């Protein structure tokens, strides 16, 4: 959490970007190391240094790292897609889940159809028993989320998402019905 680079008098990315001296108690230093200048640049561009300072001062010290990582993710998403930001990524993933659920339902229907026809013919084994029924996992079985987000490597989800006109994911949003709306006609 604490930046070891301040011990060598290297300013944090925030102070370097803002062209000010990085003091020993700098609130940005633990979260914006000098090796990640784009992280602060994006956060500053979207939220502003003053607003981030106010936010960090209002939080408890153990909450600040998660807040900065969240701000950095949201800022990168907004820089990549000024219109939809994080909502574009969420909508894209929801549509992908919906499409895959339809594919799974179709495959299950095919399995059930073939299973019924082989059972009716008296074939040994019932294929219908093999139909996959997805079950939601109890919350205690979910894998832990990794709250650490590094801007040095781009988000895998955001890299897989196709880019539309102006970087928006308009063609993948549910309310567009597969038609990209050009020229801001919403």
Curated annotation (Swiss-Prot):
Record-linked PROSITE patterns: LOB
InterPro entries registered for this protein in UniProt: LOB
Biological processes per GO annotation: organ boundary specification between lateral organs and the meristem
Keywords, ordered alphabetically: Developmental protein
Record-annotated LOB domain positions: 10-111
Keyword Transmembrane helix found: no
Induction: Positively regulated within the shoot apex by both ASYMMETRIC LEAVES 1 (AS1) and ASYMMETRIC LEAVES 2 (AS2/LBD6) and by KNAT1.
Organism superkingdom: Eukaryota
Tissue-specific expression: Expressed in a band of cells at the adaxial base of all lateral organs formed from the shoot apical meristem and at the base of lateral roots.
GO molecular function, one term: transcription cis-regulatory region binding
Database matches in PANTHER family: LOB DOMAIN-CONTAINING PROTEIN 4-RELATED (PTHR31301), PROTEIN LATERAL ORGAN BOUNDARIES (PTHR31301:SF91)
Family listed: Belongs to the LOB domain-containing protein family.
Known role: Not known; ectopic expression of LOB leads to alterations in the size and shape of leaves and floral organs and causes male and female sterility.
Protein name as catalogued: Protein LATERAL ORGAN BOUNDARIES
Originating species: Arabidopsis thaliana (Mouse-ear cress)
């Amino acid at each position: 959490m604490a930046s070891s680079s301040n011990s060598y008098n290297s300013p944090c990315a925030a102070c370097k970007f803002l062209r000010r001296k990085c003091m020993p108690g700098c609130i940005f230093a633990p979260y914006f190391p000098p090796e990640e200048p784009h992280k602060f640049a994006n956060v500053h561009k979207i939220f502003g240094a003053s607003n981030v300072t106010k936010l960090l001062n209002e939080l408890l010290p153990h909450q600040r790292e998660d807040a900065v990582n969240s701000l950095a993710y949201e800022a990168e998403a907004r820089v990549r897609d000024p219109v939809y930001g994080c909502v574009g990524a969420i909508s894209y993933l929801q549509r992908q889940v919906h499409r895959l659920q339809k594919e799974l339902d179709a495959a299950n229907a095919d399995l059930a159809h073939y299973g019924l026809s082989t059972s009716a013919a008296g074939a040994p084994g019932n294929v219908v028993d093999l139909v996959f029924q997805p079950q939601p996992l109890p919350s205690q079985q979910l894998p832990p989320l990794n709250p650490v987000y590094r801007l040095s490597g781009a988000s895998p989800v955001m890299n897989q998402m196709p880019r539309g006109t102006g970087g928006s994911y308009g063609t993948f949003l549910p309310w567009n019905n597969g038609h990209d709306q050009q020229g801001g006609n919403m």
